[in-house]
Amino acid sequence: MNSVLNSGRTTICDAYNVAAHDPFSFQHKSLDTVQKEWTEWKKNNHSLYLDPIVGTVASFLLKKVGSLVGKRILSELRNLIFPSGSTNLMQDILRETEKFLNQRLNTDTLARVNAELTGLQANVEEFNRQVDNFLNPNRNAVPLSITSSVNTMQQLFLNRLPQFQMQGYQLLLLPLFAQAANLHLSFIRDVILNADEWGISAATLRTYRDYLKNYTRDYSNYCINTYQSAFKGLNTRLHDMLEFRTYMFLNVFEYVSIWSLFKYQSLLVSSGANLYASGSGPQQTQSFTSQDWPFLYSLFQVNSNYVLNGFSGARLSNTFPNIVGLPGSTTTHALLAARVNYSGGISSGDIGASPFNQNFNCSTFLPPLLTPFVRSWLDSGSDREGVATVTNWQTESFETTLGLRSGAFTARGNSNYFPDYFIRNISGVPLVVRNEDLRRPLHYNEIRNIASPSGTPGGARAYMVSVHNRKNNIHAVHENGSMIHLAPNDYTGFTISPIHATQVNNQTRTFISEKFGNQGDSLRFEQNNTTARYTLRGNGNSYNLYLRVSSIGNSTIRVTINGRVYTATNVNTTTNNDGVNDNGARFSDINIGNVVASSNSDVPLDINVTLNSGTQFDLMNIMLVPTNISPLY
């Protein structure tokens, strides 16, 4: 493998939502600021039927996993979703989901759900009151035992959670179930973290450690299975498919992906699952099913490890007189083809038509690490501009953190933007995707031209998709255009998404695999002796390196960092796993050993995997955990 070179970075100041010069801007933001941004998002930016509280709660939980401060998450979470003891926000989530799915609870079921919400709020309120009394004996009477209160609350959660899983309404109630599960798992985590202060016995502590693992498993599997059952029934255009996925990820899987990390503390989760957004224009009318999703997903993800610079392509604008003697004219705009560009001179395959005559280029203007794209306009339609002038428009426009806009056409219509997310990739589809492409997902970093079948009427067309991700701790661009990951300056741990590799050998047998119960997607190795290299900018701290892997069959993992080799042999998670069936993967977190991230230098981290015949292997997460904080289970 090539040696790693640091291209360096110049820091400048800008201000727009997320400060691009601060690679840890999310961690530095107050929760009040996060809440205001999601409220503004709902008010001004998006038509998606989504209550802003769902984004706020996800940010809150990520902040808590990344912190040692605040061991009573349940109390703070209660104040977020039951402000002033009200269940209105939870009811808002239900109403928004009813609108999105075009389904409603019947009168009796709605009454039951509302009663359960009221009861859940009251139970959480009472438990927190009892803990307050226990911790402040001079103020109120002390309960006989906090353990009794803990066990009672545990049973109340077990009684109430099934009420959000009612037959016939599982998908509709899934966002409420996820919030109730947030409360339950936060409660269990609180019990473990406060065991000494609350006088919890060693036996009870062991029980609750098991609870955290087991209910994380049960709730994750329920959410994954419910979503996948619904997704398999889709037969719709791309815009609707992506909107359904985005809705469920924001409402449900933002939480599911955090639950399996509840066992860690002071761990900065620096990446996550992607959100995909497209335009709602009428031209791209091909219907897709879940069988087509592996290809579409691979197309949108294939170059996620590179630093996005923009896209170029061919556009066409025609103006002609209106027919039948009508005054004025009609102007049509069309994006014929596009190619996505990355730092380091890397480009994707052609989308829409190949070859094509390029006549425009859309870039971030300034270095992409300093001013990444945060908002996209990918809509299209027709309207009347001036007297008797009709314009059929298409947008394909992007905005950076500086508020600068650029693109193939003018920004108009609905925009795609999510607080604390950056557009880390751009992709797209032609007018019609060929069957031979739909049946053959792209391998890692594959460059493939994607065009409509020959002879398709109007087939030279491209429709963009923006790929949004929380990833921000990027120190610099590697010489090959990929990311160099930045470790925090303090002793906070951090994660690296496996799909954000510097380079991978055996690329034709390496694929990105979608995951739900994990912070982001996995890298699936299908060939023996595959090595993925990651590059991180160190801080001099030592960490315990954990690799989250799924190895259905035996494998050997060799990690090389700072010239030292760490080996884990006979890795097999077929039965020895955390219990979550994550899109075919069954993962376990393997403690590789203590590693040092050398200070002020770019550190290569090589992960080599040898596989026994028939082994299915997914590298799902790379976690560098502070050495003085052990996982809760």
From Swiss-Prot:
GO molecular function, one term: signaling receptor binding
Keyword Hydrolase: no
Annotated coiled-coil segments of the chain: none
UniProt keyword Translocase, yes or no: no
Keyword annotations of the record: Plasmid, Sporulation, Toxin, Virulence
GO process annotations (BP): sporulation resulting in formation of a cellular spore; symbiont-mediated killing of host cell
Pfam family name, one: Endotoxin_mid
Top-level taxon of the source organism: Bacteria
Disulfide bonds: none
Record function comment: Promotes colloidosmotic lysis by binding to the midgut epithelial cells of lepidopteran (Manduca sexta) larvae.
Additional information: Toxic segment of the protein is located in the N-terminus.
Family (UniProt): Belongs to the delta endotoxin family.
Protein name stated in the entry: Pesticidal crystal protein Cry2Ab
Species assigned in the record: Bacillus thuringiensis subsp. kurstaki
Gene, per the UniProt record: cry2Ab
